[in-house]
Amino acid sequence: FNNAQGMRTSREIIETAFSDIISPRDVWSVTVCAYRGDSIRESFSKMTSKRLGYMEDTYEFFVIANESQTLQNYADFRALKYRIGAGRSGRRLYSAEEFSKRQREVHEMYLLLCEYCNSQRDDTDFYSRTSLWMKRQYLLMLVTDWVTRLPAADQDKGYTAIVETWGAADAAIMLFDPLIARGESLLSKNSIPPGNDEFYRWGQILAKIVPMVDDGRNLPRYDQYRQLEQALEHHVAEIQLKEQQALQAEQERIEAQARFKKGTLMRRVIDKVMPAGSLNRDLVSVIRSHAQRAKRER
């Protein structure tokens, strides 16, 4: 965190942590900052009195950043060591029920964040854009948890909870990131993925959601996914064709080798019984010649 970015003031503070306007972006971690007493008490007085759940620090730091007037970055400052992303839950796997509960908590917190943004009377367009940006971040974090922390057997059930909580459109949009990334990864490999690969499993989940959203016509990146799906089908077909051709070539090689070995043995027998130049050998040659001529004349 020890980035020497100098002083941030007013609107810059929230833009630094909650937008892509200023780079590099600051993290929204309440625990890596020191606060002036009056300022932080004033910020907390503007927050909801409701109990927050999973990822609650995003809401807290959003309000703090918006209410603050100055943010000073200090380089080479050593204090509490905090591991971003390990939080209260660590990195263990979730059950479908636990994931469902946590994603509901995030959605409830997002609604509270929107409520706070709507209470800001100046520059409503800015707060509308910022809350929408936060929504995308929440969806991205949730789908990352869904991919990495839910067993494959629970992912279908977990995504049903997302659809019920966030709606079909948002649920479909958040699925495109891992789905397209997985498809592009498969497309770069010279191998045929198994039928239960994540790309196919996640695609089946998406197929259930798309009919709820006007058949996907209004979904960003849906066309990109469909093109990728077709490209992967073509890619797999090409690999299968090459494998079949290689198998056929190998079979022909084995058969030719067998014929060669058989022919070699027969030639040895003929050479032994009817040596070259012998009357019997010449007689056989004449008979074969007449037989071939008769065959051509028919």
Language model features: what each stretch is:
Residues 143-298:
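Membrane-interface aromatic/basic loop that binds lipid-linked glycans or pyrophosphate carriers
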